[in-house]
Amino acid sequence: MPKVIVGNLEFASIEDYLAALEAWEEARAPFKAQAEVLADEFVDYLREQGLSKGTISKHGKNIEMFIVYLTQYTDADDLATVRKGVVNTEFFRWYRRKVLDRCDPASLESTTRKFFKFLAEKKGIYNEKVLGKRGK
């Protein structure tokens, strides 16, 4: 029976791969659910700020893709400890490869920065790696 190789992982069969994938998705489910709720609350927060529908839509789509990236393509399990490189460089590279959209990296950076500021100000989730030390 042929082996299944994914990245640097090797599985004896497709069944083993699918079982491992299912277990991984199950383990990630709580973080994914939390991140999706926070993304929805972020969009509500943007509405409360009086931003235009177009701006809200763009930030909403960007943060939705960021959550997909975090929950499906990284091992992140806490928004307070996500590295700045994951938020900026790695997410931007992934976005360019996976999303058929000519999004400006500055737009993605603006969205993720607003999202992490929202988390800090409204949810008490402060990510020093992304926002820097408090008071700076």
Q: Which residue stretches match the model-derived regions?
A:
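Helix-loop junctions and short alpha-helical segments
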Residues: V4-Y17
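A conserved mid-domain beta-alpha-beta active-site/ligand-binding segment of alpha/beta enzyme cores
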Residues: A33
